[in-house]
Amino acid sequence: MTASIDLSSYRDQHFKGSRSEQERSLRDSTTLYVGNLSFYTTEEQIHELFSRCGDVRIIVMGLDKYKKTPCGFCFVEYYTRAEAEAAMRFVNGTRLDDRLIRVDWDAGFVEGRQYGRGKTGGQVRDEYRTDYDAGRGGYGKLLSQKIAPNTDNR
């Protein structure tokens, strides 16, 4: 394998199975995790970019588990490993919607994984962010809740 398609150190902590089963699934997978997306990036934009590397089988948009709105990630599944490897080589680190996107191997989409795992429904990484990021909903959600004006005082 070349460096651009090697497995990263990230592992899904909710994977159902042993570490060796997860490693095997990642090495055989045709599914990619795509992160650092703008909340406004559409499935059509993702399809247009990733279809340059092969036939996309399915795209599953990551959603806020409470609002059911996009929350900055998705899964892209190809028909073959070679197509997924091409996306790892050529799409990882490219710009989409003015953001550098991150592409990583995924062991395969399982229903329920399309929802953010953070306390407020989105991604954990967006809950504690202290910088303002217009493409990802402004300030971090937990910080926004702390500084939101109290409108109940009359």
UniProtKB/Swiss-Prot annotation:
Location within or outside the cell: Nucleus
InterPro entries: NCBP2, NCBP2_RRM, Nucleotide-bd_a/b_plait_sf, RBD_domain_sf, RRM_dom
Keyword match Hydrolase: no
Domain of life: Eukaryota
Name of a matching Pfam family: RRM_1
CDD domains: RRM_NCBP2 (cd12240)
Cellular component terms (Gene Ontology): nuclear cap binding complex; nucleus
One GO MF term: RNA cap binding
Keywords assigned by UniProt, alphabetized: mRNA processing, mRNA splicing, Nucleus, RNA-binding, RNA-mediated gene silencing
Domain RRM: start-end pairs: 30-108
Electron transport as UniProt keyword: no
GO biological process: mRNA cis splicing, via spliceosome; regulatory ncRNA-mediated gene silencing
Annotated mRNA binding sites: Y10, Y33, R102, V103, D104, W105, D106, R113, Q114, Y115, G116, R117, Q123, V124
The family this protein is said to belong to: Belongs to the RRM NCBP2 family.
Protein's job: Component of the cap-binding complex (CBC), which binds co-transcriptionally to the 5' cap of pre-mRNAs and is involved in various processes such as pre-mRNA splicing and RNA-mediated gene silencing (RNAi). The CBC complex is involved in miRNA-mediated RNA interference via its interaction with Ars2 and is required for primary microRNAs (miRNAs) processing. Also involved in innate immunity via the short interfering RNAs (siRNAs) processing machinery by restricting the viral RNA production.
Subunit-level organization: Component of the nuclear cap-binding complex (CBC), a heterodimer composed of Cbp80 and Cbp20 that interacts with m7GpppG-capped RNA. Interacts with Ars2.
Protein name: Nuclear cap-binding protein subunit 2B
Naturally occurring in which organism (per UniProt): Drosophila virilis
